[in-house]
C-alpha cells in the first residue's frame, strides 16, 4: 500500500471514529476541520519529519565538487578566499580530507584522483597558506540538493533533517571511515550518538598541517568532550606546544570542536562510496538531525 492509499484509509477511519462519538454534533464544518487536521498530521507522519528546517542555497564552481555531485548528505564548508573574485567558495569534507594529515596515503591518493582539475590545485594552495584552517574555512551545512549548470546550486541544511523538496527521500551524512573517532569507553552503547567535527594541528616536515576527525559520542556536554579530546591527543598536544615554542609563532590553540548534530545509534551504518571507479569505505549516519553549534577551541 502506497502513502496516498494509507492516508485515505486513515482519514476514513478518522471519520468513522468521529461519527461514533455521540456527544459530538457532526456537521460539514466539524468534519472538514477534523479531516484537515488529520491530513496535516499524516503528511508529517508519513514523511517521518517535521516541516521546520533551516537551509541555505548557494552557488559554487562544479569543478570543486566530485562525489558531492552524485551523493547527497555531504558536509560542506564555506571558504573565504583572499581574492576579489570569487570571494567565497564552498568545498566538501572529502575535498579537505585530501590534504589532511590523519588520512592515509592510499585514501588521500584516491581523493586526489576524484578531484582532478587546475582549480582544485589553486584552492588547495590557498587553503595551505592559511595560518589555521579555520581562519578562512568554516562549517556550512549538509547537502540536500545539488543542481548542475555553469555553476552548481547547493542546498545545505544547517538545522533540521536532510530531505528533498518533496520530502520523499531522507538523506543522512556520509563520512570517511578513516576519520571517524569514537572516544567513549564503550562506543555506541547508548541510543543516541552526538556528532562533532574536530580540527587539530600538527607539525609535518617543519610545516603546520591540519587533521579532521568526526567524533561519535554519547556525551552532549561540550566541555566534557574537550577534556576527553585533550586526553586523547595528549602526545600531539605536547608536540604542538613544542612547535609553538620553537617557531615563535602567535598561534593560540591546538584544536577546535563543533557539534553538527545527532542521530540514533542504530542508524549508524558502514558502507562504500563509489565515484569514477574509485571505492572508499565510509560511515553513513542515516536520519541525522543537523544542529550546528558554536565552535570551541582548546590547547
From Swiss-Prot:
Keywords in alphabetical order: Capsid protein, Host nucleus, Virion
Entry's Gene Ontology BP terms: viral capsid assembly
Key word Iron present: no
Signal peptide: none
The UniProt record lists the keyword Lipid metabolism: no
GO molecular function: DNA binding
Localization (cell): Virion; Host nucleus
Main location: virion
GO cellular component: host cell nucleus; viral capsid
Pfam families reported for this sequence: Herpes_VP19C (PF03327)
Alphabetical list of InterPro entries matching this protein: Herpes_1
Family listed: Belongs to the herpesviridae TRX1 protein family.
Subunit text: Interacts with TRX2, MCP and capsid vertex component 2/CVC2.
Reported function: Structural component of the T=16 icosahedral capsid. The capsid is composed of pentamers and hexamers of major capsid protein/MCP, which are linked together by heterotrimers called triplexes. These triplexes are formed by a single molecule of triplex protein 1/TRX1 and two copies of triplex protein 2/TRX2. Additionally, TRX1 is required for efficient transport of TRX2 to the nucleus, which is the site of capsid assembly.
Protein name: Triplex capsid protein 1
Source organism of this protein record: Human herpesvirus 6A (strain Uganda-1102) (HHV-6 variant A)
